[in-house]
Amino acid sequence: TEEGEFLHEGGGVR
């Protein structure tokens, strides 16, 4: 999801 991608980016996953 878009929110999931945001969380991933914020968490440094990407």
Curated annotation (Swiss-Prot):
The keyword Cytoplasm does not apply. It comes from the Eukaryota. One of its GO terms (cellular component) is extracellular region. The keyword Secreted applies. Heterohexamer; disulfide linked. Contains 2 sets of 3 non-identical chains (alpha, beta and gamma). The 2 heterotrimers are in head to head conformation with the N-termini in a small central domain. Cleaved by the protease thrombin to yield monomers which, together with fibrinogen beta (FGB) and fibrinogen gamma (FGG), polymerize to form an insoluble fibrin matrix. Fibrin has a major function in hemostasis as one of the primary components of blood clots. In addition, functions during the early stages of wound repair to stabilize the lesion and guide cell migration during re-epithelialization. Was originally thought to be essential for platelet aggregation, based on in vitro studies using anticoagulated blood. This is Fibrinogen alpha chain. The lineage of its organism: Eukaryota, Metazoa, Chordata, Craniata, Vertebrata. The gene is FGA.
